[in-house]
Amino acid sequence: MGINASHVPETCYHHCNQTFESSRQCFKWCQELARKDEYKIYGYPYSTNTRRVLAVLHEKGLSYDPITVNLIAGDQKKPSFLAINPFGQVPVFLDGGLKLTESRAISEYIATVHKSRGTQLLNYKSYKTMGTQRMWMAIESFEFDPLTSTLTWEQSIKPMYGLKTDYKVVNETEAKLEKVLDIYEERLKNSSFLASNSFTMADLYHLPNIQYLMDTHTKRMFVNRPSVRRWVAEITARPAWKRACDVKAWYHKKKN
């Protein structure tokens, strides 16, 4: 007899498989966990941080209940949402009684709980592979994201709020991004992806801002570098990422 372990942490799943014959109570417990309510995510489908978490959920083939926090309407500043996250930011991720904020922390949690399911996003087979991946995840957070978030805000998000793009800021930020992308180009000449020759969380973290920037003048900075262009084309074409960007699916609560 098998069990549906889509939401059961691996430790529980393996333990109960081993003890099932002698422990009906353990098996019943695992069945109850497997049938528990799906994950809930408070977010906004246009939010880069929300999309980062959605990409992980889709890479793992997990279902979720999307709860809209309309950032343009200011829902994140309302007392009802601040009671959920006092920082007033999305996403907020609920797994039963566990509440998590910060998209990268949420992403690593999901990928760790479901490490044997779907795409292997955390390549921690050895200390060396772990170190390399963690390094590139940090590079994304501290070198790539601050610049590309500024460019995304100025060119893509501001217009949603009816605000004008500050092209002086754009030009200054692009000058800094040039140096970062030169380093990426050298890395990607010798590696299919950033952390290894397979797609990992280090690549996934880059997707939200890249997706927006591909529709701006900044696109040229990515396509003018052959190795970066190849990498961008490959990661943005992933089915899980396309689903993460499907705004209609969010509002229609389309699930896996």
Swiss-Prot record:
Coiled coil: none annotated. Its EC number is 2.5.1.18. Keywords: Cytoplasm, Detoxification, Transferase. Its main location: cytoplasm. One of its GO terms (molecular function) is glutathione transferase activity. It catalyses: RX + glutathione = an S-substituted glutathione + a halide anion + H(+). It comes from the Eukaryota. InterPro entries: Glutathione-S-Trfase_C-like, Glutathione-S-Trfase_C_sf, Glutathione_S-Trfase, Glutathione_S-Trfase_N, GST_C, GST_Phi_C, Thioredoxin-like_sf. One of its GO terms (cellular component) is cytosol. Residues 126-256 form the GST C-terminal domain. It is found in: Cytoplasm, Cytosol. GO terms for biological process: toxin catabolic process. May be involved in the conjugation of reduced glutathione to a wide number of exogenous and endogenous hydrophobic electrophiles and have a detoxification role against certain herbicides. PANTHER family: GLUTATHIONE S-TRANSFERASE F5, GLUTATHIONE S-TRANSFERASE RHO. Belongs to the GST superfamily. Phi family. This is Glutathione S-transferase F5. It comes from Arabidopsis thaliana (Mouse-ear cress). The lineage of its organism: Eukaryota, Viridiplantae, Streptophyta, Embryophyta, Tracheophyta.
